[in-house]
Each structure stands twice: as C-alpha cells, then as structure tokens.
Design a protein with these regions (language model features):
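Acidic, Ser/Pro/Thr-rich low-complexity regulatory regions
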Residues: 1-105
C-alpha cells in the first residue's frame, strides 16, 4: 500500500465513522466515499456496493453551495423526496458504513 492509499483508507474510515455518528450527512458522505474508493483500488469492491447504489440514487439532490442555484420551492420538493428516500435506506447505509469501518479500520 502506498502512502496515498493509506491516507485515502484513513479518510474512508473517518468518513464512514462521521456518517454513522451523523456528524456528516449521508449524501455528502456517500459522494466522498465513492470518490475515495478509487484511490485505494476498490473501484469494484462489493464492500462499497450499497454506498455506490445510494450515491447513484441521490446524485440529483444538491448539497452545499449547489443549493443556491435552485428555487426555494424546488428545494423543498427535493428535500421532501430525499427525506423519504433516507427513511427507507438509512439502516442499510449505516450498516454498510460499519462494515467499511470494520474492514478498513
């Protein structure tokens, strides 16, 4: 493992831990994990499948500064849709984060 891979691995574990503790929202966290998994050579790892699926299903929802580009009414609609999806998917996503922590931590 190279130094960069070790750093990325630590960042993955820290991100997953932040998602489990709810100090990082699941959408932002999943986007970060999907980007970092390539840096450790885990592009096709089954460990990340739930995260990849969640990220794919939520890529239309703006976070952070991107929200400023949308009308308030549309943001309310998107936020409602996202909340409903999170209610259904959160348990599986948190379980996936815990597996990542156990496997890579």
């Amino acid at each position: 493992m190279t130094g960069n891979q070790g750093k990325a691995r630590r960042e993955i574990v820290q991100t997953a831990m932040a998602m489990v503790s709810e100090s990082l929202d699941l959408v932002s966290g999943s986007r970060r994990l999907c980007a970092l998994r390539h840096e450790i050579g885990a592009s096709d790892s089954e460990l990340f499948y739930p995260i990849i699926g969640f990220e794919s299903e939520t890529d239309i929802y703006p976070v952070g500064d991107a929200r400023a580009q949308y009308s308030q009414g549309y943001l309310q609609q998107l936020d409602q849709e996202l909340e409903e999806y999170l209610d259904r998917s959160k348990p599986a996503l948190v379980a996936a984060c815990k597996r990542i922590i156990e496997s890579l931590g």
